[in-house]
Amino acid sequence: MKFIYSDGGRSKYFKASNVGDCAVRAIANATGKDYKEVYNSLKKLNNGKTCRNGTPNEVTKKYLKEQGYEWIATMRPGTGCKVHLKEEELPTGTLIVRLSKHLSCVKNGIIYDTYDCSRDETRCVYGYWIKR
């Protein structure tokens, strides 16, 4: 799967690069919204807590639903991995994919993130958010 480096606009506002802001980056990359706008929205939903050390799933879920995104589960407990971070196994379009301890943006088969999180296309996709 192809990979393009993108911090979602974080470097315009913050110097540190090794932070846990994958939810903010993935959403900014997928929506085209400004990093700081997404950061502030998630922080507000997270009771004022920073989004640079991880964002609770409930916060991300609430925000994305408010933005018109739909959750598509690709895995259920006990079923094993059915979909990997692999172009042939994902639909075309813009997706925010949920991986183990990570969110990333995939646009038409290309990963937009700060690193190639596909693990050579073996990484399991638990599900994805798509705008309907």
Model-derived regions: residue spans:
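Active-site nucleophile-adjacent alpha helix/oxyanion-hole segment immediately C-terminal to the catalytic cysteine
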Residues: 1-52, 57-68
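Intrinsically disordered, low-complexity, compositionally biased regions/tails
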Residues: 12-13, 84, 131
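Conserved active-site-adjacent core of cysteine acyl-enzyme catalytic domains
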Residues: 46-101, 107-116
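Noncatalytic regulatory segments and standalone regulatory/sensor domains
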Residues: 113-132
